[in-house]
């Protein structure tokens, strides 16, 4: 009996050593033939980065507002730096009319730290470009910069850079113009190289984080703006006419609690970076458009009750959040140097916050409207669900906030937010309820940045783009 017990114990102890060994796929072997094929009918790719994924430069001074890190970087705690980083404010003006001299100037690729609660996806963006390179896509930005010599071969991958501070619907309209421009380029190159006149060009779009919201608005509404009266635009799927595949990597479709926390508190990206005050961040409409939905109960008062509307300006003013925080008056003074009266400056700041909140409410309602996309548009979600991610916060009578609950996600975006899951906890026995009709969903056990490093991400993305069946 002892001998049998010893043998059994030995077998049990040896089981882990006999377990399966997982290997990463040989992507070159899998996709090299497809990648090397010159196919005039292969869809070109547009890559859209998310928050902070584009370099920002002041057109007047040449100063790099975002994208120069270390010595010489713009400090948002100085008068000049604060006004460069923040967007202008002005009472009686629409958000779209509040312009400064800063513009996007290309995409970034390799900076990694946390900002606004979102790990900067710049490294993730590089990994996306590297993956597409394996698939044989020739990137215009890399080619024109001389980073890669493609010879005389035409470009099949385009980086869409944009000012990520602005209203996301505005960025979607810029995307509409960008796609029209690249359509003409692809048509001209295809006729020149293959003698084929393309009547239309369909693109595949790959997005990361907030870039997914830019693309989602575009495929739904094309270049249409949000109406000034607060109503929703007509859902035409105008942009979907130019898109076959839309890949969204870690998109905050249902918002992120981190966006709320950093609008309230400001943020210090990393040890070597300056603090970005709440008033500076509060000038950026896009950040409000990343707020979580009230119906998902991300916020509770000191009695455990959810406020009816997270976009209610009175809620923010009564709790002294963001631009409404009296402690931000010094920053507001730096942002409005021509306004002598403290009362007038506060009036302008509160007006800006109100406009940004109402615009965000309108924008998210436009995205959340349930609708079936055209059959030709296929949607792929790649998200993380193995990291604890902020889910619920509670505020006391003085407006102070404490995170109370976490949930599965990628450390930045909840699984439920990426899916745009409308189920409440008591309904999780039912199948997914979402206004987004996903064609394919892939969960990766990585954080917000690590998703694009995972071999499963690379393999599945290339299959989806290169091999998956398409509508004729």
Where would I find each of the regions flagged by the language model?
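Positively charged n-region of N-terminal signal peptides that target proteins for export
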Residues: 1-5
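Generic detector of short alpha-helix boundary/capping microenvironments
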Residues: 6-7, 234, 370, 449
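Bacterial N-terminal signal peptides
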Residues: 6-16
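Generic alpha-helix initiation/capping and coil-helix boundary signal
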Residues: 7, 120-121, 349, 353
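A residue-level signal for beta-strand positions that form part of recognition/binding surfaces
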Residues: 15, 45, 376-379
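N-terminal non-catalytic accessory region
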Residues: 17-206, 210-284, 290, 298-311, ...
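Alpha/beta-hydrolase fold catalytic core
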Residues: 140-141, 148-170, 174, 297-397, ...
């Amino acid at each position: 009996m002892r001998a049998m017990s010893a043998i059994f114990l030995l077998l049990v102890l040896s089981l882990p050593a006999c377990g399966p060994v997982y290997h990463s796929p040989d992507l070159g072997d899998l996709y090299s033939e497809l990648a090397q094929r010159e196919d005039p009918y292969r869809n070109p790719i547009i890559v859209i980065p998310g928050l902070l994924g584009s370099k920002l430069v002041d057109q007047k001074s040449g100063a790099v507002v975002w994208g120069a890190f270390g010595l010489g970087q713009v400090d948002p705690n100085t008068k000049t730096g604060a006004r460069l980083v923040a967007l202008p404010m002005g009472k009686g003006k629409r958000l779209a009319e509040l312009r400064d001299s800063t513009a996007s100037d290309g995409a970034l690729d390799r900076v990694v730290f946390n900002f606004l609660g979102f790990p900067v996806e710049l490294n993730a963006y590089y990994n996306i470009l590297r993956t597409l390179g394996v698939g044989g896509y020739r990137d215009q930005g890399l080619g024109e910069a001389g980073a890669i010599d493609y010879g005389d071969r035409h470009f099949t991958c385009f980086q869409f850079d944009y000012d990520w501070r602005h209203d996301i619907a505005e960025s979607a309209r810029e995307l509409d113009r960008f796609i029209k421009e690249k359509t003409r380029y692809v048509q001209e190159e295809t006729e020149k190289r293959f003698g084929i006149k393309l009547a239309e060009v369909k693109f595949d779009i790959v997005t990361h984080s907030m870039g997914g919201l830019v693309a989602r608005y575009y495929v739904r509404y094309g270049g249409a703006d949000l109406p000034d009266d607060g109503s929703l635009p007509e859902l035409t799927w105008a942009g979907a006419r130019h898109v076959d595949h839309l890949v969204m990597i870690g998109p905050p479709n249902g918002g992120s609690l981190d966006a709320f926390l950093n609008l309230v508190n400001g943020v210090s990206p990393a040890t070597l970076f300056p603090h970005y005050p709440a008033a500076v961040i509060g000038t950026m409409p896009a950040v409000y458009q990343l707020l979580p939905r009230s119906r998902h109960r991300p916020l509770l008062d000191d009695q455990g009750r959810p406020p009816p509307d997270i976009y209610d300006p009175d809620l923010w003013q009564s709790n002294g959040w963001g631009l409404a925080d009296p402690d931000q008056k010094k920053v507001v003074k730096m942002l409005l140097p021509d306004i002598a009266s403290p009362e007038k400056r506060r009036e302008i700041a509160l007006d800006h916050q109100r406009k940004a909140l109402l615009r965000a409410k309108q924008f998210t309602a436009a995205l959340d409207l349930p609708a079936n996309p055209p059959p030709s548009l296929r949607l792929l979600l790649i998200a993380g669900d193995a990291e604890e991610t902020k889910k619920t916060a509670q505020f006391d009578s003085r407006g102070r906030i404490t995170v109370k609950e976490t949930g599965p996600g990628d450390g930045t975006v909840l699984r439920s937010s990426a899916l745009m899951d409308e189920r409440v906890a008591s309904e999780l026995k039912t199948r997914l309820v979402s206004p987004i009709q996903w064609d394919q969903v892939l969960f990766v056990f990585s954080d917000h940045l690590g998703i694009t490093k995972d071999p499963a991400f690379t393999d599945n993305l290339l299959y989806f783009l290169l091999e998956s069946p398409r509508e004729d």
